[in-house]
A protein has these predicted regions:
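Short gly/ser-rich anion-binding loops that grip negatively charged ligand groups
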Residues: 55, 79-80
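Short alpha-helix boundary/capping motifs
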Residues: 57-58, 97, 251
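Short acidic/polar active-site loop segments enriched in Thr and Asp
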Residues: 75
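Short, conserved structural micro-motifs that define repeat-unit consensus positions
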Residues: 80-81, 94-102
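Surface-exposed amphipathic alpha-helices with a cationic face
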Residues: 90-97, 194
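A short, histidine- and acid-enriched strand-loop-helix "catalytic/donor-clamping" loop
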Residues: 100-115
Length: 274
């Protein structure tokens, strides 16, 4: 199948980054014998804009996507996280290529209002929506036109290459990495845990409580030293929702602790998550 994948590829970023959700999706498509072309909406907008001011290139990016669809004739278009590609553009694609399937894949939480609005807008025009939240909480989008599916955060074997479950010499007993503070009070829980364990274990909280965040290879090096980690979302309670922290930890054999309200005990093996 010929796939056109619309997402942000960070073509203008040259510093320490790690594999993205979108990149893992693309690797998976290729591994399953599909041909994939990428359209990095934010980069195209910046390339097309006067003086490289991305916001001035939004209309041009939509035109370029239409041009790419016409030039490549994809069987499937996967729309990832985008605030640039419009519903009107997707409707034009529908008119011009009625046999092409459109799906939206979304890995962001529903408690962020702009993301919920984005899902609803795309659900009105695409064939299916895949979200890293369970169907129980996706019912709010029922009746908008698209079929709704849960999709777990992907683990990529060329990225998650460790198996810490087989190691006994790891210096970091417990880990929590995050510098996000919007829509959350989770640092209160992290502080309580940090105070409770005291000097009994080596608990690293990169990005919080004065410890600098780690990115790219530095983050990978931290994971390579870690026994256990906290998988805490900015808000808890959405069915089966988690950030891609779950795949980064589980894929590398790190035992993780998650909030019970997410319901992961319904399908995640007990030996991988508490």
């Amino acid at each position: 199948m010929k796939i056109l994948h619309v997402d942000y590829d960070r073509l203008r970023t040259f510093g320490p980054i790690r594999s993205s959700w979108a990149e893992k999706m693309r690797f998976g498509f290729i591994r399953n014998n599909h041909y994939v072309r990428s359209f990095s909406d934010r980069d195209v907008a910046a390339f097309e804009a006067p003086l490289g001011v991305r916001a001035l290139g939004y209309k041009a990016a939509n035109r370029r996507l239409l041009e790419m669809v016409e030039g490549n004739e994809p069987d499937l278009i996967v729309i990832g996280h985008t605030d640039i590609i419009t519903v009107d553009t997707l409707k034009l694609i529908r008119q011009r290529r009625p046999d092409c399937l459109l799906i939206h894949c979304n890995c962001d939480p529903l408690f962020v209002p702009s993301n919920s609005d984005r899902i609803a807008a795309f659900a009105s025009v695409v064939d299916a929506v895949f979200v890293t939240t369970g169907l129980r909480d996706l019912r709010r989008y029922a009746g908008l036109g698209a079929r709704l599916y849960y999709i777990p955060n992907p683990v990529e074997p060329t990225v998650e290459v460790l198996d810490n479950s087989q190691r006994t010499d790891l210096p970091i007993d417990l880990l929590f990495c995050s510098n996000a503070t919007k829509f959350t009070k989770r640092l209160e829980m992290v502080k309580n845990i940090k105070d409770a364990v005291g000097g009994e274990m080596n608990f690293k909280t990169y990005g919080s409580f004065g410890e600098p965040p780690v990115w790219g290879p530095d983050y990978d090096k931290v994971l390579a030293q870690t026994r256990m980690a906290l998988n805490l979302n900015r808000q808890e309670g959405d069915h089966w929702y988690t950030s891609d922290r779950m795949s980064q930890l589980g894929g590398n054999g790190v035992l993780q602790f998650a909030h019970s309200s997410g319901g992961f005990d319904e399908y995640v093996p007990a030996e991988t998550l508490v």
